[in-house]
C-alpha cells in the first residue's frame, strides 16, 4: 500500500514555513507512526518561497532489518532506484556522514548526473538523508529524508519526504508531481525487492 501526502503549506507562496501537519496526517493514516517520534523529528521541513515539499509512504511486507539493508546502502542506490544506472563514491567511504556519490541517470529523463552528499545515516533509528550538491539536472537544493518504522500489520512502513527548488518555468505543483512519480516508483521497487528477499529467507528457514 502506498500513499502520497502533500501539505498545502508546502506549495504556497510566502516566507519559509514548517510543515508539521504532514506528520499529523501520517499518524492518522498509519497509527504505528504515532508511537514513533522519529517521523515527526525528521520529516518536519523548512520550505522556502520558491520550493516545494512532499512525501510518500510505502508499506512493505518484510522485516525492517531486511528493508534497511537495502535502503542504507548510500553506495548502491541503483539497487532499487531504477532511474539510476550507476553510482560511484567520490568522497569518503559511502558509510559515513559527509560521503559523496555521483550517480548517472538513465536516458529519457531531464538529467544526466547528480552529485549527492550523505547527511544522515542512523542504523539505530533507521534514518538516511542526502542532499544534492551538484550535477547536470534541474532539481537544485534537493534534500531527501527516508525513515523506516515497524508496522504490526505489514512489517515496515517507509516514509520518504523531500524539499526541492522549483525549476524556472515550472510550478510547484508540476515539480512535486514529477518528483513524486520518481519517489513512488523507487519505493514500489524497494517493496518488491525486500518482500522477495524476505520470502526467500523464510523459504530457506523452512527447509
UniProtKB/Swiss-Prot annotation:
Keywords: Abscisic acid signaling pathway, Cell membrane, Cytoplasm, Disulfide bond, Membrane, Nucleus, Protein phosphatase inhibitor, Receptor, Vacuole. Its main location: cytoplasm. The record marks 110, 171 as: Involved in interactions with PP2Cs. It is found in: Cytoplasm; Nucleus; Cell membrane; Vacuole. A motif (Gate loop) lies at residues 107-111. Abscisate binds at residues 81, 111-116, 138-144, 160. Residues 45-195 are annotated as: START-like. Belongs to the PYR/PYL/RCAR abscisic acid intracellular receptor family. This is Abscisic acid receptor PYL4. The gene is PYL4.
Amino acid at each position: 500500500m502506498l500513499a502520497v501526502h502533500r501539505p498545502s503549506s508546502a506549495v504556497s507562496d510566502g516566507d519559509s514555513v514548517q510543515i508539521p501537519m504532514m506528520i499529523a496526517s501520517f499518524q492518522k493514516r498509519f497509527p504505528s507512526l504515532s508511537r514513533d517520534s522519529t517521523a515527526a523529528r525528521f520529516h518536519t521541513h523548512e520550505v522556502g518561497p520558491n520550493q516545494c515539499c512532499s512525501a510518500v509512504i510505502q508499506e512493505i511486507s518484510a522485516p525492517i532489518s531486511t528493508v534497511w539493508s537495502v535502503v542504507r546502502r548510500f553506495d548502491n542506490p541503483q539497487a532499487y532506484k531504477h532511474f539510476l544506472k550507476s553510482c560511484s563514491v567520490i568522497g569518503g567511504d559511502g558509510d559515513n556522514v559527509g560521503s559523496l556519490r555521483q550517480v548517472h541517470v538513465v536516458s529519457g529523463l531531464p538529467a544526466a548526473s547528480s552529485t549527492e552528499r550523505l547527511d544522515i545515516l542512523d542504523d539505530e533509528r533507521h534514518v538516511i538523508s542526502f542532499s544534492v550538491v551538484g550535477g547536470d539536472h534541474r532539481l537544485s537544493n534537493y534534500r531527501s529524508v527516508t525513515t523506516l518504522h515497524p508496522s504490526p500489520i505489514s512489517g515496515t512502513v517507509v516514509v520518504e519526504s523531500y524539499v526541492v527548488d522549483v525549476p524556472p518555468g515550472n510550478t510547484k505543483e508540476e515539480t512535486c508531481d514529477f518528483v513524486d512519480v520518481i519517489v513512488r516508483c523507487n519505493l514500489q521497487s524497494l517493496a518488491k525487492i525486500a518482500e522477495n528477499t524476505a520470502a526467500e529467507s523464510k523459504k530457506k528457514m523452512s527447509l
